[in-house]
């Protein structure tokens, strides 16, 4: 998504006007609609709220083309069935990593414009940062963190799943010198 629309721009979204939040890790900086068109194959008006990750594009394009995938482990999965209005194999979570610049940020996440590694996993309802801070996805501005054991059974189950996802990813501790 190139981390959102420029901050100087506003745009209509449903019944509200939203501001661009480029370089923020909140929903307005990372959430982008995916539009797919294939007249005669994709039923008009088909919509899906399934999560799609960039790694899903290779298997999806291969699926559309009927190409054989190499016998290698891929992180992505085809979302072509969902495009056709079928159930498919939707993701349970997505992982995002963002390291925008080479200086330290003033905040651990949210405003990442000045640097700072920001990593999180999210599902349809919850978003968990690597530092353990959790938000409801519906809290688009991330104003109300959910304390540990404060999300109810469904939320704490999601927290455990999302933490496992984060733990499965590498930690990028080495920083590059600017200009290298």
Task: Please annotate each region the language model reported.
Residues 165-179:
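Bilobed periplasmic-binding protein-like "clamshell/Venus-flytrap" ligand-binding domains
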Residues 31-32:
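Catalytic cores of eukaryotic secretory-pathway lumenal/extracellular enzymes that build
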Residues 5-20, 24-25, 42-46, 50, ...:
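C-terminal cap/loop subdomain of S1 sulfatases and analogous C-terminal strand-loop tails that border
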Residues 1:
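Active-site neighborhood of phospho(di)ester-bond hydrolases with catalytic His/Asp-centered motifs
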Residues 35-37:
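Short beta-strand-to-turn element immediately C-terminal to the catalytic PLP-Schiff-base lysine
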Residues 141-147:
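Surface-exposed loop/edge segments in extracytoplasmic proteins
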Residues 28:
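Ligand-binding/active-site lining segments
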Residues 158-166:
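Short amphipathic alpha-helical coiled-coil/interface segments
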């Amino acid at each position: 998504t190139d981390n959102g629309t420029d901050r100087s721009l506003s745009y209509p979204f449903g019944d509200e006007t939203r501001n661009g939040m480029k370089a923020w890790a909140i929903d307005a900086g990372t959430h982008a609609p995916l539009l797919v068109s294939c007249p005669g194959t994709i039923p008009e008006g088909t919509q899906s709220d399934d999560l799609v990750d960039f790694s899903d594009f290779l298997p999806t394009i291969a699926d559309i083309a009927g190409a054989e995938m190499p016998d290698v482990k891929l992180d992505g999965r085809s979302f072509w069935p969902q495009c056709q209005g079928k159930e498919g194999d939707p993701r349970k979570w997505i992982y995002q990593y963002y390291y925008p610049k080479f200086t330290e940020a003033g905040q651990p996440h949210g405003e990442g414009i000045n640097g700072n590694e920001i990593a999180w996993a999210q599902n349809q309802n919850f978003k968990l940062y690597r530092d353990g801070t959790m938000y409801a996805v519906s809290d688009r501005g991330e104003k109300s963190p959910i304390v540990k054991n404060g999300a109810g059974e469904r939320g704490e189950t999601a927290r455990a799943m999302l933490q496992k996802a984060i733990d499965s990813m590498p930690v990028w501790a080495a920083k590059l010198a600017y200009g290298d």
